[in-house]
Curated annotation (Swiss-Prot):
The keyword DNA-binding applies. It is found in: Host nucleus. Forms a complex with the ssDNA-binding protein UL57, the DNA polymerase processivity factor UL44, and the alkaline exonuclease UL98. Interacts with the putative helicase-primase complex composed of UL70, UL102 and UL105 proteins; these interactions may coordinate leading and lagging strand DNA synthesis at the replication fork. Belongs to the DNA polymerase type-B family. Gene3D superfamilies: DNA polymerase family B, C-terminal domain (1.10.132.60), DNA Polymerase, chain B, domain 1 (3.30.342.10), Helix hairpin bin (1.10.287.690), Palm domain of DNA polymerase (3.90.1600.10), Ribonuclease H-like superfamily/Ribonuclease H (3.30.420.10). SUPFAM superfamilies: DNA/RNA polymerases, Ribonuclease H-like. The lineage of its organism: Viruses, Duplodnaviria, Heunggongvirae, Peploviricota, Herviviricetes. It is an enzyme of class 2 (transferase). Its EC number is 2.7.7.7. One of its GO terms (cellular component) is host cell nucleus. The gene is UL54. Transmembrane segments: none annotated. It catalyses: DNA(n) + a 2'-deoxyribonucleoside 5'-triphosphate = DNA(n+1) + diphosphate. This is DNA polymerase catalytic subunit.
Length: 1242
């Protein structure tokens, strides 16, 4: 029992907890003197904390000071308290000379001349009447945290206007019309000479003015207003940080040096060890150094308890946070001791080497007393939830991590904590970051719309678990700390049936967590102190596993390399997708050439929120009805932006310089002559010059020659196809010939691309003007080549890992260029470029196929690449796939032997790869000579840097349809497959296992392979007359075994689990007849834990109308009781399929048509009606729907074997297995004893 004397309030002396007298830390309790009046707060305490085993909560308002107990010592929680655990002191003396520091995060803010910050007159001049301040957070070479305040960077954009003075007056007038809040600013207008990047031959933009405004908040509002009113403006959404990075060549992630500065001792804006002020001209980058200093990291996890016994909801006052675990560790350079940082010799030092906060870096915050959690774990005990949350936030502020991680913390843990603090306890969480709120500090997250959240809560009160948003859509911003949620990282990095922490721990760490059900957590927590220790160990292990995942995957190194390359803050790499990376890189490249990037206005464009604008004084969670660009996420790091879609897309609609994602452009750029002689921009289908709207085909696919190939199939693909096309053909905004171009161009210097609809796009060649995109790509490709060369020579594993992340960042960013030009709602779409890239890719694929057809079968050509031993001896001249072969004993021999006859043919082409079937050559010879063949094709057909590469050779291949195939690769174990059920996450393990066995027979058993080839050459009538080839019987035997396993209760429920992704909030689904939605509703009705948006929902198909285990069935723990659906169920109408899940009863003799049978299909019940949670099925012995599962088996096997089934106009391949499988009657379990007796009587 835990005695809590603080429920009555007003206690100032020692406290008794657990029967022990508590000692007060000197100076911490402030027992003497008058205490300032304390605002009351609500105490919520589980009753079981005070009375072991009791349920319920105790709620009480008190006016006393919040408290914490650490090692039996009472501590008052306040902002000026000294955290009691051991921690490494960072006593920093005044630094003399230049400061070299590594920056990892940046924020922008607007200060006014009367700001209370301690700014010297040297820099305060930049604040008249207001000015931008850019704060660079980082660490010095010795590991001290630092904040560098940079003054003097103005915000500017460009506008076409003939009268400079008049434009200044217009801007002053616009400043009075923009939305509130409006703040004072200084403005200057100067003429500029720049050229729009759109179009070759355009003149410099006439009457171009550079509008410079001291206040970024007002600069953005004024620029957007001018854009809305139709003024031709350029680069209005580029923030001052991006301006500084580009104009001064500063890095957003890497080493910098500040040469002249003022040291801040008093009036600091941040909580960093070092804070200095400098002018924008005093900050310089330190190039060619990709090393890291040591950064503090924090991994945390929370445990909650619902007052109603369901899954906890943050908005409900009874659903409280009961424990928080934290793991403090470091990442980056060498150990702190090696770098000469003192390790706390004042008696507060850490006991473990490299630990900078606590005895071992492991911390547990809990309500009530707690037993022994583990050796050297620092345990903090709190009387109530409010004090627990306040203690954690103070701990967070004291520790001041550079990186914060966890598992699904964006959508749950952080969101839960901030919701409780903001809406229940009215605490401003933003004051706990490295910047106080007044200095532009932010501690908040963007969440999806609250509208459907309310609908969800109304429809399912017990299901409103405060997690309606997907992780990808929730963006977290903490000033001075970068949040890396490992849940979306794992989803982007791996292909797994589910992404639970336990699954990822097994995959990456070879570890399993000791699981504790959320239903058992409340029971253990209220039991006693030892029960709370058990929950604490469970909570702590999650934080430890996430730390290990963080250090194993090393995503932070990869993101840091991209931030440095793309010149954007690290948090934007994590949350804002790929478009902003290309835009900023393009902006940087254009700045060197006096190019500018135009803006255009679209309906619905809103002024983006930025770091410098407070959304509300206490807004820790910002819910917006529509946050443009929320689709950008960590996943975007590992895939290209999608090609152009006809429907509007929210992909990466991010404007440079905004803290959130404002859609930068909607509609299609079309080009025409404008008043400036430059390129006009329009949202209409036709530009000013009358150019027709552009449409084009997407990814190139040659229709495959479906079938099973026992001959080797070589695969060739183009290396970095789309980037190489841009470089090879000089494609760019700046090389596109458009109406209004001033200079005539020699036709020999023009590269033309004609689309399928007859529209032609023309680009000047590199001899006339080098493409900006091409030069940027060339620079990055060369840089990647140099990095990979350094990797080969590097011996240091840490340095090698950093180089590997850098080359990967270069590769991913290069591959994003095509999507940048082709996404209609992107930041700078240019459909002529995207359409031309696609068309050139199609032409390259077609030319490759023709070249292979014309040359690869010619003896004189083959003689240059292959030797005598490379040919297959004994190839029949007449043995081709077109010749029909009868079953065994009926084949006719034809043709003699031709030892060196080779046939090569392209059987499939997919975007950037071609599949070539070779007859007459060994697989080993193709593997050895494949690179030489690819090099020869490249030299004959293409220009640099386009390169055709040899990828692999399939020894045998089943070509099912486009983007779906299975094959056995030469020199590799197992099968390579794409698009089949075996690699889909929705199929259950039982179906996958049967399909895998069938494929193993097909590819490993020679007799089965030959039988499959013979079967593919038979007609349906021949199969009816002669039967299937003998070797194919083995496949049928495996299917019969699978059918018996299902009907005779031999299959575990774990192997029958199906799944679907919850892609959006449940209230947004229009279809109610989806199995996973039905399962979520059943879980909500039982108040069980619900999945998050983005999770996979698992379910099992159960027998209709049955909810108990049938008598006589076996259940040995591993095997699950499975019921058999009676054939009479269909007659009664209980098996009525409305979702296409069932097929008609199999095994009709002689292929009897379905319409002649009166009975309904045996599997005709809707899937959503019989879908159930696997745990519920296992616990209650619910029988499964054997018919449906066997239909799934037949469908899966048919999908992979259909190319070898007999064809013809009257043949239905989906019914073939039903026809050839032997029939068998499965009785209900209740009838089995009678069937045995009848058998004995016979």
């Amino acid at each position: 029992m835990f005695f809590n004397p603080y429920l009555s309030g007003g206690v100032t002396g020692g406290a008794v907890a657990g029967g022990r007298r508590q000692r007060s830390q000197p100076g911490s309790a402030q027992g003497s003197g008058k205490r300032p009046p304390q605002k009351q707060f609500l105490q919520i305490v589980p009753r079981g904390v005070m009375f072991d085993g009791q349920t319920g909560l105790i709620k009480h308002k008190t006016g006393r000071l919040p408290l914490m107990f650490y090692r039996e010592i009472k501590h008052l929680l306040s902002h000026d308290m000294v955290w009691p655990c051991p921690w490494r002191e960072t006593l920093v003396g005044r630094v003399v000379g230049p400061i070299r520091f590594h920056t990892y995060d940046q924020t922008d803010a607007v200060l006014f001349f009367d700001s209370p910050e301690n700014v010297s007159p040297r820099y305060r001049q930049h604040l008249v009447p207001s000015g931008n301040v850019l704060r660079f957070f980082g660490a010095t070479e010795h590991g001290y945290s630092i904040c560098v305040n940079v003054f003097g960077q103005r915000s500017y954009f460009y506008c076409e206007y003939s009268d400079t003075d008049r434009l200044r007056e217009v801007i002053a007038s616009v400043g009075e019309l923009v939305p509130e809040p409006r703040t004072p600013y200084a403005v200057s207008v100067t003429p500029a000479t720049k050229t729009s990047i759109y179009g070759y031959g355009t003149r410099p933009v006439p009457d171009l003015q550079c509008v410079s405004i001291s206040n970024w908040t007002m600069a953005r509002k004024i620029g957007e207003y001018l854009l809305e009113q139709g003024f031709p403006v350029y680069e209005v959404r580029v923030d001052p940080l991006t301006r500084l990075v580009i104009d001064r060549r500063i890095t957003t992630f890497g080493w910098c040096s500040v040469n002249r500065y003022d040291w801040r001792q008093q009036g600091r804006a941040s909580t960093c060890d070092i804070e200095v002020d400098c002018d924008v001209s005093d900050l310089v980058a330190v190039p060619d150094d990709s090393s890291w200093p040591r950064y503090r990291c924090l991994s945390f996890d929370i445990e909650c308890m619902s007052g109603e016994g369901g899954f906890p909801c943050a908005e409900k006052s009874d659903d409280i946070v009961i424990q928080i675990s934290c793991v403090c560790y470091e990442t980056g350079g060498n150990t702190a001791v090696d770098q000469g940082i003192p390790n706390g010799n004042d008696g507060r030092g850490c006991t473990s080497e490299g630990v900078i906060f606590g005895h071992s870096g492991l911390h547990l915050f809990t309500i009530g007393t707690c037993g022994q959690v583990g050796p050297d774990v620092d345990v903090y005990e709190f009387p109530s939830e409010y004090e627990l949350l306040l203690g954690f936030m103070l701990f967070f502020q004291r520790y001041a991590p550079a990186f914060v991680t966890g598992y699904n913390i964006n959508s749950f843990d952080l969101k839960y904590i901030l919701t409780r603090l903001e809406y229940l306890y009215k605490v401003d969480s933003q004051r706990f970051c490295k910047l106080p709120t007044a200095q532009g500090g932010r501690f908040f997250l963007h969440s999806p719309a609250v509208g459907f959240k309310r609908q969800y809560a109304a429809a399912f009160p017990s299901a409103s678990h405060n997690n309606p948003a997907s992780t990808a859509a929730t963006k977290v911003y903490i000033a001075g700390s970068v949040v890396i949620d490992m849940y979306p990282v794992c989803m982007a990095k791996t292909n797994s049936p589910n992404y639970k922490l336990n699954t990822m721990a097994e995959l990456y760490l070879r570890q399993r967590k000791d699981d504790l059900s959320y239903k058992d957590i409340p029971r253990c927590f209220v039991a006693n102190a030892e029960g709370r220790a058990q929950v604490g160990r469970y909570c702590l292990q999650d934080a430890v596993l996430v730390r290990d995942l963080f250090n194993t995957i090393n995503f932070h190194y990869e993101a840091g390399a991209i931030a440095r390359l793309a010149k954007i803050p690290l948090r934007r790499v994590i949350f804002d997708g790929q478009q902003i990376r290309i835009y900023t890189s393009l902006l940087d490249e254009c700045a060197c050439r006096d190019f500018i990037l135009p803006n255009h206005y679209s309906k619905g464009t809103t002024v983006p929120e930025t770091n410098s604008v407070a959304v509300s004084p206490n807004a820790a969670i910002i819910s917006t009805a529509a946050v443009p660009g929320d689709a950008g996420s960590v996943a975007a790091m590992f895939q290209m932006s999608p090609p152009l879609q006809s429907a509007p897309s929210s992909q990466d609609g991010v404007s440079p310089g905004s803290g959130s994602n404002s859609s930068s452009s909607v509609g299609v750029f079309s080009v025409g002559s404008g008043s400036s002689g430059g390129v006009g921009v329009s949202n209409d289908n036709h530009g000013a010059g009358g150019t027709a709207a552009v449409s084009y085909q997407g990814a190139t696919v040659f229709e495959p020659e479906v079938g099973y190939y026992n001959d080797p199939v070589a695969v060739f693909d183009f290396a970095s196809l789309y980037p190489s096309i841009i470089m090879a053909h000089n494609l760019c905004y700046s090389t596109l010939l458009v109406p209004g171009g001033e200079y005539p161009v020699d036709p020999a210097d023009v590269y033309s691309v004609t689309l399928e609809n007859g529209v032609t796009h023309r680009f000047v060649r590199a001899s006339v003007r080098v493409s900006v995109l091409s030069e940027l790509l060339n620079k990055w490709v060369s840089q990647r080549r140099a990095v990979r060369e350094c990797m080969r020579e590097c011996q240091d594993p840490v340095r090698r890992m950093l180089l590997d992340k850098e080359q990967m960042a270069l590769k991913v960013t290069c591959n994003a260029f095509y999507g940048f030009t082709g996404v209609v709602n992107g930041m700078m779409p240019c459909l002529p470029i995207a359409a031309s890239i696609t068309r050139i890719g199609r032409d390259m694929l077609e030319r490759t196929a023709r070249f292979i057809k014309d040359n690869f079968s010619e003896p004189c050509f083959l003689h240059n690449f292959f030797n005598q031993e490379d040919y297959v001896v004994g190839t029949r001249e007449g043995d081709s796939e077109e010749s029909s072969t009868l079953p065994e004993g009926l084949e006719t021999s034809s043709g003699g032997l031709n030892e060196r006859r080779v046939e090569a043919r392209v059987i499939y082409g997919d975007t950037d790869s071609v599949f070539v079937r070779f007859r007459g050559l060994t697989p080993q010879a193709l593997v050895a000579r494949g690179p030489s063949l690819a090099h020869y094709v490249t030299a004959c057909l293409f220009v640099e840097p386009v390169k055709l590469e040899f990828e692999k050779v399939f020894v045998s291949l089943m070509m099912i349809c486009k983007k779906r195939y299975i094959g056995k690769v030469e020199g590799a174990s197992g099968l390579s497959m794409k698009g089949v059920d075996l690699v889909r996450k929705t199929a259950c393990e039982f179906v996958k296992g049967v399909t895998r066995d069938v494929l193993s027979l097909l590819f490993e058993d020679r007799e089965v392979s030959e039988a499959a080839v013979r079967l593919s050459r038979l007609s349906l009538d021949e199969v009816k007359k002669y039967g299937v080839p003998r070797g194919f019987w083995r496949i049928l035997r495996r299917l019969v075994q699978a059918r018996d396993d299902l009907y005779l209760h031999r299959v575990r429920v774990e192997d029958l689990v199906l799944s679907s992704v919850l892609s959006k909030d449940i209230s947004l689904y229009r279809q109610s007849n989806l199995p996973h939605i039905a399962v979520i509703k059943r879980l909500a009705a039982r108040s069980e834990e619900l999945p998050s948006v983005g999770d996979r929902v698992f379910y099992v198909l159960t027998a209709p109308g049955v909810r108990a285990a049938p008598q006589g069935s076996s259940d040995n723990g591993d095997s699950v009781t499975t019921g058999v659906v009676s054939r009479s169920d269909a007659i009664d109408g209980t098996d009525d399929d409305a979702d296409g899940g069932g097929v008609e009863e199999s095994n009709r003799r002689g292929g009897e048509p379905a319409k002649k049978r009166a009975r309904k299909p045996p599997s005709a019940v809707c899937n959503y009606e019989v879908a159930e949670d696997p745990s519920y099925v296992r616990e209650h012995g619910v029988p499964i729907h054997a018919d449906k599962y066997f239909e799934q088996v037949l469908k899966a096997v048919t999908n992979v074997l259909s190319p070898v089934f007999p064809g013809g106009e009257t043949a239905r391949k989906d019914k073939f297995l039903h026809m050839v499988l032997p029939r068998r009657l499965h009785l209900e379990p209740a009838f089995l004893p009678y069937s045995v007796k009848a058998h004995e009587c016979c």
